[in-house]
Amino acid sequence: MAENLLIHTGSKEEKYRELLPQLQALVSSETNRIANLANIAAALKQTFHFFWVGFYMVEGNELVLAPFQGPIACTRIRFGRGVCGTAWKEAQTLIVPDVELFPGHIACSCLLYTSDAADDKA
């Protein structure tokens, strides 16, 4: 597969519809999980311009940082801690409108609190 994604402008749903078959083609011939996760993270960040997108892998009672795109992240998250650890503990997806208001939120990146962001909060 080509290294370029072909995503047209449109709604988030339309972009996901266009992206999914391209991701499937991208990972179908690669057997290395790390390589596939790295490309998936890059494709999601490139398509949606997310602040951070990535993966954690289970290692014992912790989530360990795996391929990601964005600023430096927490390397390990304990079971039941923060949004990710809580989602793992509850075995379900959590949609959190404002992670700062989530009980037990783990602030992994100070970039969330730049002067522009601080000005927006004031």
Which residue stretches match the model-derived regions?
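Solvent-exposed polar/charged
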Residues: Q46-H49, K89, D116
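Intrinsically disordered, low-complexity terminal regulatory regions
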Residues: M1-A66
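Single conserved hydrophobic/aromatic residue that forms the stacking wall/gate
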Residues: Y113-A122
